Amino acid sequence: MADRSGGSTAGDTVPAPPPVRRRSSANYRAYATEPHAKKKSKISASRKLQLKTLMLQIAKQELEREAEERRGEKGRALSTRCQPLELAGLGFAELQDLCRQLHARVDKVDEERYDVEAKVTKNITEIADLNQKIFDLRGKFKRPTLRRVRISADAMMQALLGARAKETLDLRAHLKQVKKEDTEKENREVGDWRKNIDALSGMEGRKKKFEG
């Protein structure tokens, strides 16, 4: 009896899998244009917002710290350069002398500032000149964009050789010139080849050859 349990026997053959067909470009295009479900991000929206807020807070703290450091450096520089004035117990003449000294210091600082500004302006001008020279050198060695231009052989030779182009292009100058009269004379001499053969045939023709 045959086994009815659904199992395959020794004589049964397993069907071969269908051949894999390559998708056409149209199918690929259709697949690409079809809307697909977007992959879910591993980070939720609330978590992203929290991280952005934290980054902004850290950046704000860094900016505040840098501003505080600049203010501290400015205060230290002013304390070393501008010492506090001691005005207690000074008379009118002493105050005038102190004012004159302060004015002299201000004038000296202005002169130094003017000298520094002149040096900075000179350096900026020199840098601009050097940059201009660099651009000029780049422009000299820059390869221009070439365009296709239709030009005849005569025009090309004229551009390359100049006045000598006419001599080189005159190809007929070295050829042998044959006059029209010479060709007509040769044609008359040839004439009808049958008559020449008849004239030279027979005894008379042989006689003419010996006589000639």
Curated annotation (Swiss-Prot):
Sequence ranges of Polar residues compositional bias: 1-11
Modified residues (Phosphoserine): 5, 24-25, 44, 46, 79, 152, 201
Cited SUPFAM superfamilies: Troponin coil-coiled subunits (SSF90250)
Ranges where the record places region Disordered: 1-45
Residues modified as N-acetylalanine: 2
An annotated GO cellular component: cardiac myofibril
Record region (Involved in binding TNC): 34-81
Record PTM: Phosphorylated at Ser-24 and Ser-25 by PRKD1; phosphorylation reduces myofilament calcium sensitivity. Phosphorylated preferentially at Thr-33. Phosphorylation by STK4/MST1 alters its binding affinity to TNNC1 (cardiac Tn-C) and TNNT2 (cardiac Tn-T). Phosphorylated at Ser-44 and Ser-46 by PRKCE; phosphorylation increases myocardium contractile dysfunction.
InterPro entries: Troponin, Troponin-I_N, Troponin_I, Troponin_sf
Biological process according to GO: cardiac muscle contraction; skeletal muscle contraction
PANTHER family per record: TROPONIN I, TROPONIN I, CARDIAC MUSCLE
Protein's UniProt name: Troponin I, cardiac muscle
Organism of this sequence: Bos taurus
